[in-house]
């Protein structure tokens, strides 16, 4: 594998954002914390991009992009519900930190499931596969099966099988 493990990359990005949000609650400087998290994410992503682009992958054979419009609609509805819950809890003079955490718990769980374990973008090359733009795997590192019109891909250190309709 060249690059970084996609799951660890995404989890580290979410942890950086979570820490910056917690720091912004105490220091009231949300913009600085937000920019710092995206600078750290950008440096890590640039490192992965350079590692993958310097690898001899061969010719691009096929690309599978992640479906996302249904998930985005669902997340938008959850964000509206989250704001509503936050306003209800804040109006009853609960602690603002507790209302912040409770109102965004559901949204965070859905984001975790879709962002971390959702179907990633995969590019098939002659010599291997680029997985979610942050890791390149040789064909020997993959377990690919075809079953009932689905392409099932199992990648080492990825928690679930990835299924795509052919």
Swiss-Prot record:
Keywords: Cell membrane, Membrane, Transmembrane, Transmembrane helix
Keyword Transmembrane set for record: yes
Primary location: membrane
Membrane-topology annotation of the record: Multi-pass membrane protein
Residues annotated as transmembrane: 7-27, 30-50, 69-89, 92-112
Annotated localization: Cell membrane
GO cellular component terms given for this protein: plasma membrane
Similarity comment text for this entry: To M.jannaschii MJ0795.1 and MJ0785.1.
UniProt name for this protein: Uncharacterized protein MJ1249.1
Species assigned in the record: Methanocaldococcus jannaschii (strain ATCC 43067 / DSM 2661 / JAL-1 / JCM 10045 / NBRC 100440)
